[in-house]
């Protein structure tokens, strides 16, 4: 796997949004699933967080993920810091500005997936966002595997 930072360890991927209560939580959960399915636990580290974390993961997101047999009911949004991101090879933002997230001089790669916030959306709309995130996470892991 390609590392953009000076780290010689695993490739580190951070999934970040403002509240860490929806999109980034779904991306993190799907990425954990990909790690296990592809046997990459020793090669990839995952991180998720928000710049202004909410108190809880959005109920609609918990339900949408449960529909795919992934339980995130026990997840708690957390704050992401510049220090967290400094060692990340990839910072995947969900529609927020990377300039507010990524530290100055950071050597990694930012990708903004520009996804709609699922908070307050209908179950069908949340499912559509969830499915798009699942697809993008799978594509990211396909790409990472080709660089090994």
Protein language model features and the residues they cover:
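Polar low-complexity intrinsically disordered regions
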Residues: 1-8, 89, 99-100
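Conserved active-site segments centered on acidic
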Residues: 2-81
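Short, charged/polar low-complexity linear motifs in solvent-exposed/disordered segments
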Residues: 42-43, 90-92
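Alpha-helix C-terminal capping/helix-to-coil transition sites in glycosyltransferase folds
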Residues: 85-87
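Phosphate-binding/catalytic loops
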Residues: 90, 96-148
């Amino acid at each position: 796997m390609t590392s953009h930072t000076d780290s010689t360890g695993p490739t580190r991927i951070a999934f970040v949004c403002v509240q860490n209560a929806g999109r980034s939580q779904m991306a993190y959960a799907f990425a954990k699933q990909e790690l296990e399915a592809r046997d990459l636990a020793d090669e990839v580290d995952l991180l998720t967080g928000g710049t202004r974390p909410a108190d809880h993961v959005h109920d609609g997101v918990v339900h949408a993920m449960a529909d795919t047999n992934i339980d995130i009911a026990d997840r708690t949004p957390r704050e992401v810091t510049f220090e967290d991101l400094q060692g990340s090879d990839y910072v995947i933002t969900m529609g927020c500005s990377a300039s507010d997230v990524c530290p100055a001089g950071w050597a990694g790669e930012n990708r903004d997936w520009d996804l709609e916030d699922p908070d307050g959306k209908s179950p069908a709309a949340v499912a559509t966002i969830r499915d798009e995130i699942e697809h993008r996470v799978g594509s990211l892991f396909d790409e990472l595997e080709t660089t090994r």
